[in-house]
Amino acid sequence: MPRSLKKGPFIDDHVMKKVEKAQESGDRRVIKTWSRRSTISPEMVGLTFAVHNGRKFIPVFVTENMVGHKLGEFSPTRTYYGHAADKKSKAKR
């Protein structure tokens, strides 16, 4: 269920402060954050965030298509190794 429009998008205060500081200074350094729940706003376009996935920080460069999504959507938390090969077919060869 989506968030109410009258509430507006949720962005952690500490993330917004870092974004505003980067915009004022024109600094393009990576912004390190654990806040996967923060919504990407238009002010964040062009910035790079290091989003924590539970183990390490994944760099996420924000583009216009990402506005409205959450930071955590672009930092996968699970490693997919692919489906295991069939052991029976290997044994026959």
From Swiss-Prot:
Stored PROSITE patterns:
RIBOSOMAL_S19
What's a BP term from Gene Ontology annotated to this protein? Answer: translation
Gene Ontology CC annotations of this record: cytoplasm; small ribosomal subunit
Instruction: Name a GO molecular-function annotation.
Output: rRNA binding
**Covalent S-S links between cysteines:** none
Cite the entry's keywords alphabetically: Ribonucleoprotein, Ribosomal protein, RNA-binding, rRNA-binding
Q: Which InterPro entries does the record cross-reference, listed alphabetically?
A: Ribosomal_uS19, Ribosomal_uS19_bac-type, Ribosomal_uS19_CS, Ribosomal_uS19_SF
Cited Gene3D superfamilies: 30s Ribosomal Protein S19, Chain A
- Does the record bear rRNA-binding in its keywords? yes
Decide whether keyword Ribosomal protein is in the record: yes
Primary role: Protein S19 forms a complex with S13 that binds strongly to the 16S ribosomal RNA.
Q: Which family does it belong to?
A: Belongs to the universal ribosomal protein uS19 family.
Q: Which PANTHER family match?
A: RIBOSOMAL PROTEIN S19P FAMILY MEMBER (PTHR11880), SMALL RIBOSOMAL SUBUNIT PROTEIN US19M (PTHR11880:SF8)
* Name of protein: Small ribosomal subunit protein uS19
Q: Which gene encodes it?
A: rpsS
